[in-house]
Amino acid sequence: MDNSEVIIRFKGLSFTYHDNQSHRPVLDDLNLQISRGERVGLIGDNGSGKTTLFHLLMGLLRPTAGAIEVFGEERQKEKDFREVREKIGLLFQDSDDQLFCPTVAEDVAFGPLNLGKSQDEALAITREVLERLGLEGFEDRLTYKLSGGEKRLISLATVLAMKPEVLILDEPSTGLDEDTVERLTEILRSSDLTYLIASHNSDFLSKTTDIVYRLGRGKLTRLVS
């Protein structure tokens, strides 16, 4: 693994919402680079721009200024972000934004099927991912009947089933009990994936990441561990 390979780079990134009456940018000339194998944490208050940054990375929003480079290429147009979405898995902050099929198996298998896997291959991936997350036997459970914590883990399963190169996790420990947070921590630490986690939980970030930045007033500040 070549840890010197920069796979995500934000250069002078700025973003302001059109309905922001204060006209203060949510992100202001922000610079960050993440190399392959790095585990990066992002902490900040509500409204500080963590989710906005993730949505910019995935092409769900467009920056007011600056550049986004992913896998060595600048990404500007919708077609530029198609490869990004295939190789980077985003866990949304709200699980209901991620889960839309009647059953757990259908939700988890949706991504692999969309990538061209057969029904049998998608089902095998679904079972493997659910087992890894300690969710054996959840295949036929109705998604809308799951608890908040269970929905969170199923959302993560849908991301992992896509076999991404990079994980972008927006508040992954929210709604999870202590035992489940511990299991999630073990899963992340044992993974060889590059990932970026936004969380209010500084203890969780200290256990799952190697570098932590604070986002505030549109700027990033690296925290000393």
Describe each PLM feature range.
Residues G66-Q76, V84:
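Conserved ABC transporter NBD signature motif
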Residues L142-L146, E150:
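Conserved ABC ATPase signature
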Residues D120-F138:
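Conserved ABC ATPase "signature" region
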Residues I43-D45:
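The feature captures the beta-strand-to-loop junction immediately N-terminal to the Walker
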